[in-house]
Structures are given as C-alpha cells and as structure tokens.
Amino acid sequence: MLMPHSAALNAARRSADLTALADGGALDVIVIGGGITGVGIALDAATRGLTVALVEKHDLAFGTSRWSSKLVHGGLRYLASGNVGIARRSAVERGILMTRNAPHLVHAMPQLVPLLPSMGHTKRALVRAGFLAGDALRVLAGTPAATLPRSRRIPASRVVEIAPTVRRDGLDGGLLAYDGQLIDDARLVMAVARTAAQHGARILTYVGASNVTGTSVELTDRRTRQSFALSARAVINAAGVWAGEIDPSLRLRPSRGTHLVFDAKSFANPTAALTIPIPGELNRFVFAMPEQLGRIYLGLTDEDAPGPIPDVPQPSSEEITFLLDTVNTALGTAVGTKDVIGAYAGLRPLIDTGGAGVQGRTADVSRDHAVFESPSGVISVVGGKLTEYRYMAEDVLNRAITLRHLRAAKCRTRNLPLIGAPANPGPAPGSGAGLPESLVARYGAEAANVAAAATCERPTEPVADGIDVTRAEFEYAVTHEGALDVDDILDRRTRIGLVPRDRERVVAVAKEFLSR
C-alpha cells in the first residue's frame, strides 16, 4: 500500500494542516476525539481513500486511552460472564495486534495465579477451566502458541522464581497463563495516529469542536484562539467519556478504574504478573504487572463515577486500600502506602442501558460498544474496550459509509502494519543493534530512525540518571510525535510523569527540547 505522506507530527505540520482546512473545501469525514477509538477511525478512513481530519481538544491519548492496564485482553473475563461474542472478538483482535498490526508494541505477558491455602478447590478448578477456555479462544482466533503459549501448572519452586515476594506458607504451585501486554497504551495511540498521518489523515491536537452537526463543525485552535467552520459528509463523535458533550442525547455511565505504581524492587523484580482473585468474586482479579521503566502497576478497580467528568480522574482512598489489601493476601511481605510511588485512574465510557438499575455494579455493565446517530446526524461510537479499537473503528466507519453514501474502499486495517512494525520501519530503516533495549521496545523497527533523526548532544543517553528514556526520544516527541508542551512529553509520549518525583527531575530537560 502506498504511503505518500510523512508519519511525522509536529507544530509545523499542525499549522499547515489547520491553514489547509480553513482554506479548503469539505472533507469526507471529521473525527472528534484523539483517543484510541478516534485515531483508529482516522486510520481506517484514510486507508480507504477518504479525506479525514481528526480533532482533539487536548493531546492525543489525553483521556481514558492512557489510563488502562496496558493489556490487550483475550476476552476470558467476558467468556466467564457469558459474553461469547465479545470474548471471541477480543481474542481475534488481540491476535491481529500481536501478529500483524503491532508486534513491536504487544508481547505475551505471563499471568501467575499462586495456589495458596486461601484458594479452595472449587476456585482453583474454576481458574484452571478458565485458562483452558482461554487457550481454546486463542486457537479459535488463529493465534499461534509461539505468540501466546498454552496455560499450564507450575511447581512452587518456579512460582517463587518469577514472583519472589509471593507468600510461601502452604504454596502449592501456581497456574500460569498468557495474555497480551502493551509496552504502553499511549504509545499505541501514537502509533495509530502517526500511521493515519502516513496515509494522509490530518491529526490536530489542541483543537476544540463546537456547534457540531452531522455535516459541520466549528473548530477553534486552542493555542491561537482562531476559529473556522469545517464541513464534512460525515461527522463522527469518538470523544469517549466526553461523548455526551457532543451529543447530549447519549447516556453514559462512567466507571473508574484505579492503578497504583510501585518500584519493581518492592516486588523483588518479578517477571510475571501476579494475578490475585478478588475475594467473593468469580471472574475478577487484581494484577501486579511488571512494566517499562522498572515499575509495577497494581490494578484495577471498577467503581461508579457519577457527576461531572474531570479531565484527570483521581483515585479514591478506598480504592487504594482495596488494591493493597487484595494483593497482600498473596504476598509474604506486605506492601503499603509507603511503597506507592504513583497512582492513576481512568474512566470507562460504559453505556447506560438502565437495565442494571441505579444499584447495579459497573463491573456487571456490558463492555460492548454501540453506534448511534443523533437527531442532527452526528454519528457517535461509545463503549467498547481498547483491545477492540480496530473492530470498533471498522464498524462505525461502515455505518457512516452506508448512512452518508460515501465512496470508499473496503477496510484494510486487519493486515496493516503500524509505524514501527517490522514491515513499516519509517524513513530510515536499520537495525536496532547498539541502541538501548528500552528504545527498541518502545519504537520497534523505528528505533533506528529515532536515533538517526536526533540532532541533540548525547542522543542515546538517559534524560536523567536511573530513568530509562533517552534524550533522542524527547527530541522525537517534539519533531515527529506532535508534542507541544511539557505534559505531552512526560505524561503521554513517555510515562515518566506517572511518578511525581521522576517527573520533577526531567521537566527542565523537556523544556530544553521544546525551546529548540
């Protein structure tokens, strides 16, 4: 497939795109929202030959898309609750991401359930049956065992090798299964957005949308305060938990999911995600997951979040206590608030069907997505899961094509490599040999281009001692990934900002690259 456009996003391209839109005619599609669903729609539209612009009032991955567990789920939880369709789709989409779209960003994550005395025979049998069902889903989805190994039981000696702080009294081995894990969710959003730009989409951050109808939007550059009207044959609302601001007829029920951040040393540097059944629940777990930058993310919760929707949700003290109490049931040495070095919370844009009633738990609300058309003709997509973003984008775009009689090719994203995948290395393909492993892990085949494009001094040195992010990555965030301010670099292009003390150490370095 031809890719005549650059994948680079930066201030100059943003300015040129805004000028072109203000001076030009109508587009085929306008997408509102720069999370994973929105960028997925922009990529799908661009690769079908449609003219498309995406506008985001903040930065890419500003909302829910950066607050996930960083997992590409195979749908096991949905199978356990009877949602066979979602489970199968999740397994299929996981396989597409791991083998075709983004093998450089998604890898197999071992999930360890330690068999402790507190876990009775019935619960053990249910977990084992669930893991076997997960194996069957993997086979059904066509994902090879070389990509996601089969589940199995392991002895206690192996359990303590891969999760050294697990409780050893009465440990009877463990159950080990595998799921997909992203190097980072915001990095996936960035890869999809830049691949969309590579195919001609205009990706515009810090641009607000108002007076939205099915064929027009008033856009305001939030940096210059200049506004202009833009027309399109289809306007798609992919604003996530903020979708109701675009179409007030939508009924959403936001659910908050909280994670705590630890230094991996607090868990003795595990190599598997410690997976702890939540007491009293059949198919819910708390995960302590090894992550990039030497961190552990512990999550997650599922709590009703009524009321005004904040830009940056905050964890509650009750959620923090719940996560610590749950994980400590499986640890020989307890972790506490003194060990927590950061925390984050995100809001799931669940559809409020009214069926569960006011007292129903958000954990029981469907994770399926839905497409709606407002009285003014705005097409909205709400609900869904990160794993299914590609399928959701295909679904809503098919609906838009039908409703608006757009002339478009068939969907091409199932087999489309994102920027950084081996088949899409960028303009300076080369080996990652000699480059920091963490750089290659975050950029894949594009890592050589990150280093080659750097004009700064000491490009492969870390931005600060003990922080495994290179100076070249800060520069690339500005020159190729559309970062316009310090928060863009620290909170979304890299995830240094999840740990406040690390953030403080590199703010000056980020400002240095923004001022160049």
From Swiss-Prot:
* Annotated TM spans: none
Q: Which UniProt keywords apply?
A: Cytoplasm, FAD, Flavoprotein, Glycerol metabolism, Oxidoreductase
Looking at the record's lineage, which domain of life comes first?
Bacteria
Cytoplasm: is it a keyword of this entry?
A: yes
- Write down the EC number: 1.1.5.3
**One GO cellular component from the entry?**
cytoplasm
Class of enzymatic activity (EC top level):
oxidoreductase
Q: Which reaction does it catalyse?
A: a quinone + sn-glycerol 3-phosphate = dihydroxyacetone phosphate + a quinol
Name of this chain's protein: Glycerol-3-phosphate dehydrogenase 1
Protein's organism: Mycobacterium tuberculosis (strain ATCC 25618 / H37Rv)
Q: Which gene encodes it?
A: glpD1
